[in-house]
Amino acid sequence: VSIFGAMFAPKPFDVAKEMVRVTRPGGRVIMGNWIPNDPTLVAQILKISSAYSPPPPEGFISPMTWGVESNVIERFGAAGIPKDKISFVRDTYTFNFPYTPPEFVAAFRRSYGPTMNAFDAAEQNGRASDLQRELEALFDSQNKSPRKDATSIPATFLRVTAEV
């Protein structure tokens, strides 16, 4: 099981192969992967953050490509899993945070790698306050909590099941 984890490892074909290798025959590999260009929170955080970050190194494969069914089929196929043994469900994870959206942005700034990197780059370019404003506007716009002192934001992801 890898929920929003293995998708961030480099070399996605090696990742799929290793997950299959360590799963016993008859077992399942289950992944939760963020979806590129999705209008919900995480894809939008990454989109905003990328505008403040330096370009990725040559050969970089975006972790978001794990949210594209054809890529997942290709990767697990190369690891020996036939297409008919791979299934997909779009699902929702709701971020519930007992503080305001700006405080939730601060938590992402402290603990979520892509956001941390974007703020590091934005600070070097004197644009950290712009990034902060954009992320706060995003979090505010997607917040579904009826309370002003809480944040509740649904985010869509692709649940992948590969039968080994």
Model-derived features: positions:
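A short SAM/SAH-binding and catalytic strip from SAM-dependent methyltransferases
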Residues: 1-13, 35
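A short, structure-level motif marking secondary-structure boundaries and short turns
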Residues: 4, 56-59, 144
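A structural feature recognizing the 12-helix transmembrane core of secondary solute carriers
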Residues: 7, 20-21, 152
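Non-membrane alpha-helical structural segments and their capping/turn regions in soluble enzymes
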Residues: 9, 13, 39, 125, ...
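Conserved catalytic/acceptor-binding region of the Class I
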Residues: 13-14, 20, 24-99, 115
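Class I S-adenosylmethionine-dependent transferase superfamily signal
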Residues: 18-19, 162
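Conserved Class I S-adenosyl-L-methionine
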Residues: 65-164
